[in-house]
Regions:
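Non-catalytic, regulatory and substrate/membrane-recognition segments associated with hydrolase enzymes
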Residues: 28-32, 37, 45, 62, ...
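Metal-ion-coordinating, acidic/His-rich active-site neighborhoods
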Residues: 14, 75, 84-136, 140-143, ...
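Long tandem-repeat architecture
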Residues: 7-8, 21, 73, 205
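Active-site beta-strand/loop microenvironment that shapes enzyme catalytic pockets
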Residues: 176-187, 205
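Residue(s) in the substrate-gating loop at a strand-loop-helix junction
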Residues: 2-19, 28-30, 64, 82, ...
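Short secondary-structure subsegments characteristic of cysteine-rich extracellular domains
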Residues: 152-161, 390-420
Length: 421
């Protein structure tokens, strides 16, 4: 079972993976060479003021002097720029976290003075035991090579395009907004800080006033999809029986518009739903809101819609309430990610109805994706079923060791071999 959490979904691949020492060692060496780099080459013009510029008529290239300067590197254009680690250390130097005090950082998103104003945030520290009122972002990091600059405490700082879009969409016109977003609030270049902050993820999301589930910008008729979900979740929908709910829904125009239902399927095929961290971020939230572009719907309503659709599909006596075409639209809608999260949500709040199970947790996380394979283990550490295994996140450990230690702890705790299936 756990083998499938690794790349290529194969127990055979896992055996080869952990036996291939050179692969892991080389990866580790690359990480060390990058993160521990103190000096890099920089190109500077020579003392001749004219030599730093190309003679446009002759086409002669300028002369350069190679020099070393700590914390600087050359970009793709040959220009001297501060390295990522140097920029990060500058940003976080005034807000170093004390793990003994269980501190986190929160960001204050500054108001939008005009539509074209750059995004500016202020960082501050807080105790997770007594946090301010903040909202936690749950989002997809996306392509790490696509970066967009913002200003953190007045200093330029690069973030992913998807997080940038979220901040731009959430930014208020006349007041600031207190948020938590891992890419900014955790020094990603500081491994020891990451190790400790990952242990606090459950508290970060459970202490938030609200978790904002950011699906991305509006595209592929996502506005239609969000509107359709809202239509299926009228007030008291949870207590409404199926005939009454369908009567309410069908009375509204364009509810079974084919274009809208295709849009719903695309919405739930977005990469966000396959993130390994989604389960923990939503399950432990006290209140969650799904945002896609400018549209939003409460997570609770989304869960109600999913349960109602499942009920409609599982009770043949309801089939006559819809035409064959309408029923097909409901039954073909992809909702497995929401279903898994809803099930774990119930297990936290009503364990007498849905018993907690470590094996069920592993199955829920099995099909998820993570840029760092270690995260498919570490994302489970907030769950009681896993916390008893006493596993601590450590991003310096080789991937195969992280998985081997987890399997050993599972076997010792559960005394079952089903994890090997």
């Amino acid at each position: 079972m756990t083998w499938h959490l690794l790349p290529q979904n194969s127990a055979y691949t896992f055996v080869n993976f952990i036996s291939s020492e050179n692969k892991v060692n080389k990866l580790a060496q690359v990480e060390i060479s990058i993160t521990n780099s103190e000096t890099t080459l920089e190109k500077l013009p020579s003392d001749n003021p004219q030599s730093g510029f190309e003679d446009r008529e002759s086409g002669n290239a300028p002369s350069w002097i190679l020099t070393r300067r700590p914390g600087w590197q050359s970009d793709e254009n040959g220009l001297a720029t501060k390295s990522k680690s140097a920029l990060a250390s500058t940003i976080y130097s005034h807000s170093i976290l004390n793990p003994k005090l269980y501190e986190i950082r929160v960001l204050e998103l500054q108001p939008d003075l005009c539509d074209s104003s750059p995004i500016r945030v202020l960082l501050s520290k807080a105790f997770i035991s007594d946090p301010p009122k903040y909202q936690a972002l749950s989002y997809l990091w996306g392509d790490s090579s696509e970066k967009v600059p913002i200003f953190v405490d007045g200093k330029r700082f690069n973030i992913g395009k998807n997080l940038f879009a979220a901040l731009k969409c959430l930014r208020l016109r006349d007041s600031s907004l207190l948020l938590w977003a891992d890419a900014v609030c955790i020094d990603q270049e500081n491994v020891s800080e990451r190790n400790f902050q990952v242990r606090l993820m459950k508290q970060v999301y459970s202490s938030a006033e609200q978790v904002i589930i950011w699906l991305g910008e509006s595209e592929d008729d996502s506005d239609l999809a969000m509107d359709l979900i809202t239509t299926w979740a009228p007030p008291n929908a949870e207590e409404t029986n199926m005939p009454e709910l369908l009567e309410t829904v069908i009375s509204k125009p364009n509810v079974f518009d084919l274009r809208s239902w295709h849009a719903v399927r695309r919405l739930f095929a977005r990469e966000y739903w396959f993130r390994a961290w989604v389960l923990q971020e939503i399950v432990f939230s006290n209140r969650a809101m799904v945002r896609c572009g400018t549209k939003q719907v409460a997570w609770r309503d989304l869960g109600v819609v999913q349960l109602k659709w499942e009920q409609l599909k599982s009770e043949p006596e309801n089939f006559h309430l819809l035409t064959p075409k309408q029923l097909k639209m409901v039954t073909l809608t992809f909702f497995s990610a929401v279903s898994s999260i809803t099930l774990q949500h119930l297990a936290r709040r009503q364990p007498n109805i849905v018993p907690r199970s470590l094996f069920r947790l592993l199955r829920a996380i099995n099909a998820s994706q993570a840029t760092n394979p270690r995260d498919k283990i570490y994302t489970l550490l907030g769950f009681e079923e896993v916390s008893v295994l006493n596993i601590k996140p450590d991003y310096t450990k080789p991937v195969e060791r992280v998985y081997a230690e987890f399997v050993q702890a599972y076997l010792e705790s559960e005394c079952k071999l089903n994890i090997l299936l």
